[in-house]
């Protein structure tokens, strides 16, 4: 039996993007809503959420403030997602 993960481990950028996308979706918002509220162009919001663009600390702070979530919480969640993506199925980190 192969214990290797079936998918490639998440990069930190992709993990952060997933957290930001989950925050947006859980609030019933679209990327354009985040764009208008934060001043970032919609394309940038999408690229960050897909992990195609590494957000600056300022961008992460602005998104965190918009969602009303401490940046530390977002970083911890992203690290947990990333770690889970590197853990073989059936095992716990």
Stretches found by the model and what they are:
Residues 39-55:
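Recognition helix of helix-turn-helix/homeodomain-like DNA-binding domains
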Residues 1-26:
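A short, Lys/Arg-rich alpha-helix, primarily the initiator
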Residues 18-37, 62, 89-90:
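Short basic helix-loop element that most often maps to the first helix and adjoining turn
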Residues 5, 39, 58-73:
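DNA major-groove recognition helix of helix-turn-helix/homeodomain DNA-binding modules
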Residues 20, 34-35, 45-48, 74:
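Conserved hydrophobic/aromatic packing and binding residues within compact polymer-binding modules
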Residues 2-5, 65, 75-93:
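Short, charged recognition helix plus adjacent turn
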Residues 15, 26, 52-55, 66:
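Helix-turn-helix/winged-helix DNA-binding modules
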């Amino acid at each position: 039996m192969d214990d290797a993960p079936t998918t490639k481990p998440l990069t930190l950028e992709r993990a952060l993007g997933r957290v930001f996308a989950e925050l947006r979706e859980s609030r019933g918002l679209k990327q354009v809503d985040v764009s208008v509220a934060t001043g970032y162009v919609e394309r940038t919001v999408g690229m960050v959420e897909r992990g195609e663009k590494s957000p600056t600390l300022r961008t992460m702070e602005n998104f965190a403030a918009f969602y009303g979530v401490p940046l530390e919480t977002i970083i911890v969640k992203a690290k947990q997602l990333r770690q889970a993506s590197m853990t073989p199925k059936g095992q716990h980190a």
